[in-house]
Every structure is written in C-alpha cells, then in structure tokens.
Regions:
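Short, well-ordered amphipathic alpha-helices
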Residues: 64-68, 128-139
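Short, flexible loop/turn elements at secondary-structure junctions
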Residues: 85-87, 123-126, 135, 159-163
Length: 216
C-alpha cells in the first residue's frame, strides 16, 4: 500500500563501521511493516541489487503462529531487526535531541518520510515477515484488539543509512557469517536445567529440540 505519513524513530547513534553510522532504536510493528522491503538475491540481475535468500514460507508461518499465541511476550523480537535506508540524504532528517551534543552514545530523533524510499531488511526478514503475516491473519479473523496490540508493540531495530548496496550486503554477510554459527549448547543445557527445576517456561523449546530454527 501507499505509505501514509512520516514515521518517528527514537535512536541512539552507536558507532561508525566502514564509514556508516549505526543507530539503535525502537519503532512500532505497524511502522516497520509500512516501511520495510526485501532486497532478494536474483542471480540474473545486472548489476546485482539484492542478497537475501528466498523467503521460507514455513518459517514465516511458524513465527506468525507463535506471535499470535504470545502477544504479551513476542519472542521474535528478542533480537534487533536490522534495516538500511538507501538514501544518504536521510541523515538530514536525523537530529540530536540536544543540538549542542551530537555524539556517539547520544539520543537522536529521525523523522522518516516516504520519499526516502523503503527500509531494506538486512537481518530479520523472516521475523519481520512473520509479524506481517500475524497482523494479516488477525485482521482477516477480525480480532481487532489483538491486532491493535501487535501493531503498537515496539521493535528493537538497528538502522544504517547507505546508498551503497555492497556495504548493505556486507553488513548482512558479517551478521550471518559470524553471528549465526555460534553453538547454543551451553544455553540449551541451562534451558533444560531450568525446565527440570520448573523455574522457566520454555517447555516448547526444550521438548521440541527445535531451539535454533524457532527464532531467526
């Protein structure tokens, strides 16, 4: 659909990596759904514009189901969703809260306007699409209170602004190449122990032995 209006982000400017400023912040599920897009890898394209693997519908539906079941505790959002806006000019719309104190670690506001183009999902495309699918299902089922609750939940995001699609793809590569290969063995053992002690509630994780694929 057409983007309705501007979106206000609350951000902290964190670090500069390979010439790009990285911001952390929060926006609502509603705003994310409205501004996001996916740069899918199409090997025949020249020049290449995308790098994301094809959506895994099963994974998206799993996340949507879990989202609808646990609207008070959205597990899909435990990790930040990374987005990039391919518009260097967007920096003009980011303002330090205190204009005499524009620094790393400082608070900023970003007034996003539709003419800046879409926010491309760098990491978290399945989670973002899962939230979108959950919203559609709640809408179709006329569960408007639940829909409202989901859409107004805040999401933890990591934001970059670069027109350089190669740098955007490199960010994706770094996240996936290094971060995802971590063995969760230690955490899994703690979860099993917590479950056996009755002190935690992730029974579905421990009993399904499906720890890795559920949240991605």
């Amino acid at each position: 659909g057409i983007m309705s209006s501007k979106v206000q982000f609350n951000l902290i400017k964190v670090i500069n990596i390979f010439g790009i400023d990285f911001y952390n912040g929060a926006i609502t599920v509603k705003d994310l759904i409205e501004i996001m897009d996916i740069a899918e890898f199409k090997p025949w394209e020249s020049p290449l514009k995308g790098y994301q693997r094809k959506n895994n519908e099963q994974k998206i539906n799993q996340i949507a189901e879990r989202t609808i079941k646990n609207l008070d505790s959205l597990e899909a959002l435990v990790d930040a969703i990374n987005i990039n806006i391919r518009q260097k000019d967007a920096e003009a719309y980011i303002k330090p809260l205190d204009k005499n104190n524009d620094r790393y670690g400082g608070f900023h506001t970003f007034t996003y306007i539709p003419s800046l183009g879409k926010a491309f999902l760098v990491d978290g495309q399945h989670r973002a699409k899962g939230l979108q699918a959950a919203a559609s299902k709640l809408q179709n089922d006329k569960k408007f209170n639940e829909l409202d609750k989901l859409l107004n939940t805040f999401i933890n995001i990591s934001l970059t602004l670069t027109e350089d699609v190669y740098k955007e793809a490199y960010t994706f590569y770094l996240i996936n190449q290094y971060a995802k290969s971590v063995s969760p063995e230690g955490a899994t053992r703690l979860m099993v122990e917590g479950f056996e002690n009755g002190s935690v509630e992730f029974q579905n994780e421990v009993t399904s032995h499906n720890t890795k694929t559920t949240i991605d």
